[in-house]
Regions:
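Acidic/His-rich, divalent-metal-binding segments that scaffold phosphate/diphosphate chemistry
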Residues: 1-87
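Secretory-pathway/luminal and periplasmic proteins that interact with or process carbohydrate-rich
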Residues: 84-88, 119-123
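Single conserved hydrophobic/aromatic residue that forms the stacking wall/gate
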Residues: 142-151
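Histidine-centered divalent metal-coordination motifs
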Residues: 80, 114, 143
Length: 151
């Protein structure tokens, strides 16, 4: 593999940055495979549940599919908890950031906010506001635009 000669970014030449851009495009093209490989790590997270996070993710995607959601939403459902491993305190935002370049603004918003919506089922047991999601009740998702995809 060819490498650049510079050790400081300001010393890079056009040809070197063109080379790096090509490598970056190749790397970007492998993103889906890396994400699917990473999904395996969800088999060992969050003890105490009856199923693993991977099983939960597969169940969520299956439910979306059976509900006749579009392909984008099925994939988003599959990936909605990928942040649990590396960003447990903001897993929703992490997952949303990963999928943002590839999905509509609406789908991005749903993944980004799903952590707040799930609080409805448990937050009151922990002395927190279970109605956190209510702040969005007047929000209209109808006007959210479709994505300009990078691919």
């Amino acid at each position: 593999m060819k490498t650049v000669n510079f050790t400081e970014m300001k010393a890079g030449t056009k040809d070197e940055y063109l080379l790096l851009d090509k490598y970056e495009q190749d790397y970007i093209n492998g993103t889906a495979d890396r994400i699917l490989n990473f999904m395996q790590s969800l088999t060992s997270t969050l003890e105490g549940y009856k199923i693993t996070r991977l099983e939960h993710s597969l169940q969520t995607a299956t439910r979306a599919y059976r509900d006749k959601a579009d392909e984008e939403m099925v994939v988003a459902a599959l990936l909605h908890d990928i942040g649990d491993e590396l960003a447990p305190l903001n897993h929703s935002e992490y997952a949303a950031a990963v999928i943002k370049p590839y999905v509509s603004e609406k789908t991005h918003w749903i993944i980004e906010k799903h952590g707040e919506f799930q609080m409805y089922y448990y937050a009151h047991h922990l002395g927190k506001n279970k109605n956190q999601r209510d702040k969005y009740k007047d929000l209209s998702l109808i006007h959210i635009s479709e994505p300009t995809r990078p691919y």
